[in-house]
């Protein structure tokens, strides 16, 4: 393991306490996050002896891309190897294509969402998730989380000023690593770093009610997504063992008390699984659960993987489910499945790579 410190692990305030004079921290941040510098010696605005000091004591990112796969829909999945040899995944999702006029002038820039991992593996044990098979290995540091985004932006030549959305929906349970995830949020939001507003960062959780409360008390301004996937405790405990510790009632109570921008909604992710939770009776129960909550439901059609216990539902059933919710006044969308041809669901690329 390297004894060098990961520069991406530090907030600007922390860096100000390590380097003198303090304004050097701002300069370093601008080189790293705005100019995508990957060598301290390139930082020409810094004194040469200071650059040498940085080179001897810090590194930029422990990430090494060992495999990537590009889907026909433009999604790109990356498998990263960390300094200790552990592997994690991240995905670049193009949300809107670039628009140009007849003269080739850009009218609207392309928009992207980057899905990042927060842990190596996961201990939640969800029966439909491939990552859960291997259990939890360790938490990612803030720098390892930030590094995924920085690497993807740099290697896809996405300019610093181009807006991206961040979703903490990759490998791991983000709220099980709240300290480092919240630190990553702050680093990314810094105007001298990537300036990604917390309102463009969504933290997804399987429903850790205690940590939802802690996240709310931090008042970071992030968006919250709840991986619900079932409308009663019996079924949810079967699909998601974490429900035995935090049942649906406790999750809903935590959500009702969670501070969120009045212009935004709490997202509820609902994975539709054929014959398991995709019936109208489930939709009816979901409407009751969400009563009084400013919510948006994101329906996701199950993405099968090798050895999966479940099947993908029909599009027809998904539309019926959506129509029922919409008719009852619940904002609801069916998430466009991206990367089906590259196994872009969480843990699939890592699993395939390990078998090769």
UniProtKB/Swiss-Prot annotation:
Iron recorded as keyword: yes
Gene Ontology MF terms in the entry: 4 iron, 4 sulfur cluster binding; metal ion binding; rRNA (adenine(2503)-C2-)-methyltransferase activity; rRNA binding; tRNA (adenine(37)-C2)-methyltransferase activity; tRNA binding
GO cellular component: cytoplasm
Binding-site residues, S-adenosyl-L-methionine: 172-173, 204, 227-229, 303
Localization: Cytoplasm
Residues annotated as the enzyme's active site: 89, 346
Record-linked SMART domains: Elp3
Primary residence: cytoplasm
Disulfide bridge positions per record: 115-346
Reactions that this protein is recorded to catalyse: adenosine(2503) in 23S rRNA + 2 reduced [2Fe-2S]-[ferredoxin] + 2 S-adenosyl-L-methionine = 2-methyladenosine(2503) in 23S rRNA + 5'-deoxyadenosine + L-methionine + 2 oxidized [2Fe-2S]-[ferredoxin] + S-adenosyl-L-homocysteine; adenosine(37) in tRNA + 2 reduced [2Fe-2S]-[ferredoxin] + 2 S-adenosyl-L-methionine = 2-methyladenosine(37) in tRNA + 5'-deoxyadenosine + L-methionine + 2 oxidized [2Fe-2S]-[ferredoxin] + S-adenosyl-L-homocysteine
Residue ranges occupied by any Radical SAM core domain in the UniProt entry: 108-341
InterPro entries reported in the protein's UniProt record: Aldolase_TIM, Elp3/MiaA/NifB-like_rSAM, Methyltransferase_A, RlmN_N, RNA_MTrfase_RlmN, rRNA_lsu_MTrfase_RlmN/Cfr, rSAM
Pfam families named among the record's database cross-references: Radical_SAM, RlmN_N
One GO BP: tRNA methylation
Keyword flag Cytoplasm: yes
Cofactor, how bound (note): Binds 1 [4Fe-4S] cluster. The cluster is coordinated with 3 cysteines and an exchangeable S-adenosyl-L-methionine.
Keywords from the UniProt entry: 4Fe-4S, Cytoplasm, Disulfide bond, Iron, Iron-sulfur, Metal-binding, Methyltransferase, rRNA processing, S-adenosyl-L-methionine, Transferase, tRNA processing
E.C. number: 2.1.1.192
Residues at which [4Fe-4S] cluster binds: 122, 126, 129
Co-factor requirement: [4Fe-4S] cluster
Family under the similarity heading: Belongs to the radical SAM superfamily. RlmN family.
NCBIfam families assigned to the protein according to its UniProt record, in alphabetical order: rRNA_mod_RlmN
Note: Reaction proceeds by a ping-pong mechanism involving intermediate methylation of a conserved cysteine residue.
Entry function: Specifically methylates position 2 of adenine 2503 in 23S rRNA and position 2 of adenine 37 in tRNAs. m2A2503 modification seems to play a crucial role in the proofreading step occurring at the peptidyl transferase center and thus would serve to optimize ribosomal fidelity.
Protein's name according to its UniProt entry: Dual-specificity RNA methyltransferase RlmN
Organism lineage: Bacteria, Pseudomonadati, Campylobacterota, Epsilonproteobacteria, Campylobacterales
Gene that this sequence comes from: rlmN
